[in-house]
Amino acid sequence: MPKKIFLLLFSLSIGIAAHAQSLYSDSVYNKYLDFNLARLQGEQDKVLELGEALLPFADKLPEKARINFYFSVGKMYEDNDEHSKALPFYEKVALATPNYYVVHRALGYLYLEKAKGIESQLGASTASDTTINHQLTLAYTEAVRKALPHLEKAQACDPSDETLAIIKTLYKNIKDDQGLNTLDSRLKELGKNCVDILDDK
């Protein structure tokens, strides 16, 4: 008899815990919906507040909703000129949905911005600063190499003369003739699988 009572109590506690978990997940999803509504209505201050409040609980969202949320948070930070905060969220989205070219465009241009900052420092340094110039050249090349794959995916899926010109210029700047010469074949291959809208259901 005590064994049956124990099993009954154990089953009840599992049921209550499962119900509480379900309510908790529903609450997180409702906060996600509130965040999206604020975004759609252009309430920037509210978007930032709701987005940052939801971040610690994002892992409770369904996978597709979580990926969509991360993209929206990246966009939120990018629009707020907090690019270093946007990058990790965009990177998560690119990792989860590698064919979603919109996130690649965002990443490509954010990394390009970093490369341009380094390029400006290079232009401002004197020729006698060989050590500094060497370090800046390495940093510039690294930033360009981060930007290029993202810009190429965006170009392959949504061609733009401006993006193509930037890609070609970057290859010339880092003196990568092989990368430049094989660009067309890479773009053709990258263009085979393109996603332009994230589904959150």
Which residues make up each language-model segment?
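TPR alpha-solenoid repeat register
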Residues: 69, 103, 163-164
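Structural register within alpha-helical repeat arrays
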Residues: 34, 73, 107, 114, ...
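N-terminal leader/linker segments that initiate helical-solenoid repeat arrays
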Residues: 19-57, 64
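Short coil/turn linking the two alpha-helices of tandem helical-hairpin repeats
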Residues: 40, 62, 75-81, 108, ...
